[in-house]
Amino acid sequence: MASALCSPCHHHHHRPFNYRRLRASPSSHARPRSGTSGPSGSTTAKYLCSRPMSTSRGGSVTCSSTEASKSKQGPDHLLILVHGIMASPSDWTYGEAVLKKRLGGNFVIYASSSNIYVKTFDGIDVAGRRLAKEVLDVVQKMDGLRKISFIAHSLGGLFARYAISILYSLKEKEMGSSSSVMPTIGGSEISGHTPGLGVIAGLEPINFITLATPHLGVRGKNQLPFLQGLSILEKLAAPLAPFIVGRTGAQLFLTDGEPSKPPLLLLMTSDHDDTMFISALAAFKNRILYANVSYDHMVGWKTSSIRRELDLRKPLHRSVGGYKHIVNVEYCSPVSSDGPHFPSRAARAKEAAQSTPNTENTEEYHKMMEEEMIHGLQRVGWKKVDVNFHASLWPYSAHNNIHVKNEWVHNAGAGVIAHVADSIKQTCLQASL
């Protein structure tokens, strides 16, 4: 069976980033969002329109001189930040500040607030639709936007994948006019798909980035490490998940829906009449996966990097490219495939996993689904960035370190956020050439 062709990415060594603590400050150019508030008086998401700022070296952090000149007319690139389970926009406080400082004035940075806290339990599909509506609201309220990117942590990556399938349109905007674009959807065509076909919320899709996202669901010690491979815990996890984390739990364990129907995460690896999951991903110029190779007890290395067990190698420890805790970067080319399937034996395995959730039944079912999901997702290319917090003060906080959930507790991930920002900046530079 086809396996993704991955090659290492070569780094240019950057001067070390000054990992001083940064706090986001409201921009004088920000346009406040009106009419929204979270439950119990929670703080709503806000616009952070990044403007050119002086660095500690006295330079101006912008994508290019061309982008800097554009910023005088206002930012045109919308960057959506999506938090994970039982979280809120405040998870991105540090990330917003760093992105604002490093990216310059051509970006509107917006932290999503439509799925805060227990709303993340309502289901990936429900949360994805909420996020899609929120993004449309933002786009409609902002003038001059031309491009869109997403950065999502953990479960938020699945919300974002669902949302872009709704926001995807087979139209290209050209100087106020639009022309239909009709790419073919078959496996081989998608694998050779040229980024740039189609738009997201009417904007040109640029970057789709996830950090520690369970793209293949959660099951067993390699997908949900805190179970420690103990059969009793694995046996209890799936049936209890819906009671603890609602519909979202069943979807993550691939046990949602009728036995005869494929689970949502499998559906999300192919195109359908009303939701173009793979075409939406393929429309982005760059797709990047950040994955913890160890110490992440919520989301395992395999599921967050969309790899098979045999593709996992011994974790590396030496940082690359001058970014602390980034230990490996590689690009996996798209692989031709006829797409994912849900054969009758998978339906029988799902029924067994639902009715008698012992380790043997669930493992057989999940292995089948895992392979099918990989078949679907590898039809687009991915840049994969492996992260290892083995040398940090709190390595077991890897799941929250990777996006610096709290700048005082999880600041070991500062190098990861810097790498994310510079990856986006590199895209800007390439586009301006």
Q: In which residue ranges do the predicted regions lie?
A:
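Single-residue recognition of alpha-helix boundary sites
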Residues: 94, 165, 223, 262, ...
